[in-house]
């Protein structure tokens, strides 16, 4: 076990200092869903009129999407949690997405759908790799081809073009080989301006897709069945502007529910749509927590002890892969043994080593972790290797004995708005420092590796 003081090498990365074993109480406000807001911003490319989005989280991923839309000629104005977008045909001067932005934000690849439908041709680099496994774009490409587009890959650039004389995509029936959220969103947006009816089978069912469909329908699209495995889209010739509120972030809500459980302190989380986190609520209740509705949110009362439960990730409505790492942190101090299986991504277990540094008893077999709960974790110097494992490190530190130092904040800032401030407001002793931090040399290689990675979850 390495203590915070066993250090010998300097890092310029900012860090969090978290003092464990402090009681939390009060209410945490949940921000708008990052994974929804990003796609809604891309969806605004489907019309020349103004699209006004409310409840947009202030995150670095939103910054990147803003830069990308500005690069291709769209007008984007941001004010706190509001975004006003307009994509005039005459202003969309570029149909090629810049490598550095697509590489930084994989979610930007969904722009290929609306840009193809609007401009008839689009070029985009292959999306940047992330540190949690392979995310093939085959489903995106096959879906666009099925709509009549010519799609090829040349020197790591995807080139998509409408080649028919009518210069419109043509509706058809498309069956995805796997439930891909990104591919469902890409093809759904493209199909709204296609000629005729498009039917998407084996479509992803995530709430963010429902949110996208709701906005598109406000814009004049005809989308039915979003949230089920079959989505029907009747194409229209043009779409109009709209005002739309981004749904609450279900992953952030789940993260703070787990924060309550791991500290054994009751919290109120609001706003929350309970149906969006049903699998998480079910598992927390099995752990011994009591959860009840409280206005537009939920109140959680952790039990005197946390019971171990097995969990397997799966696409919605199953347990979300984005909460696998925080839930493993919780199971690390649960009574008994548990098994956590990651079925969505093949390399999403980087947090195991960091939890072990804190004293967690975890053995790993490929994508399955076996956890024997310990009485308490011990504070140390740790690193979040991706967005959700960074959050897991904070939760583990809240329950640990002593003061932990956490690096990897570049990941954390991609998906959690004012994360440490929200925790401070309910009693956590947590502070961010931009200063130099001396780090344990044994973890310096991991810090270098993780700090250069990209992450979208």
Swiss-Prot record:
Pathway: Cell wall biogenesis; peptidoglycan biosynthesis. GO terms for biological process: cell division; cell wall organization; peptidoglycan biosynthetic process; regulation of cell shape; UDP-N-acetylgalactosamine biosynthetic process. The modification 2-(S-cysteinyl)pyruvic acid O-phosphothioketal is found at residue 130. CDD domains: UdpNAET. It catalyses: phosphoenolpyruvate + UDP-N-acetyl-alpha-D-glucosamine = UDP-N-acetyl-3-O-(1-carboxyvinyl)-alpha-D-glucosamine + phosphate. The keyword DNA repair does not apply. GO terms for molecular function: UDP-N-acetylglucosamine 1-carboxyvinyltransferase activity. UDP-N-acetyl-alpha-D-glucosamine binds at residues 106, 322, 344. GO terms for cellular component: cytoplasm. Belongs to the EPSP synthase family. MurA subfamily. This is UDP-N-acetylglucosamine 1-carboxyvinyltransferase 1. The gene is murA1.
